[in-house]
Amino acid sequence: MRHGLLALICWLCCVVAHSEMLNVEQSGLFRAWFVRIAQEQLRQGPSPRWYQQDCAGLVRFAANEALKIHDSKWLKSNGIASQYLPPEMTLTPEQRQLAQNWNQGNGKTGPYVTAINLIQYNSQFIGQDINQALPGDMIFFDQG
């Protein structure tokens, strides 16, 4: 019997309980950088620093790169033109490390998280209406 697809729209929560969360403005800028970096990976081909080239790897890579300082050296090394860029984020050193502290389950955190743990422990459910999705939201499909 064929099961219908259920789209779960989620927003990435790359924070752990002991880390400093991003405020609303920082979250919006993070989202903009996250989308731009992910788009560039699809447009240009994968960066040599995107080691695990699967969907979860793209999320981890884009989140990590979005939290970095996007100076001319970073732009050049990523092959990203300096036009049409989101504004730079002002972050603390702790905030810049958020994507190195994925919730891996069982009270553990680290720089790597599997796809299932990305969904279960590092995403926030928003809804099932695809019309609610914003750039940077992740859509998961449950094929039952």
Q: Where are the regions that the model predicts?
A:
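Active-site nucleophilic cysteine motif
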Residues: 48-66
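N-terminal signal peptide c-region/cleavage motif recognized by signal peptidases
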Residues: 12-17
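Positively charged n-region of N-terminal signal peptides that target proteins for export
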Residues: 1-4
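Sec-exported extracytoplasmic/periplasmic mature domains
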Residues: 43, 60-71, 141
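Short acidic alpha-helical/loop segments enriched in Asp/Glu that coordinate divalent cations
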Residues: 71-81
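Non-catalytic ligand/cofactor/substrate-binding and regulatory segments of enzyme domains
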Residues: 18-43
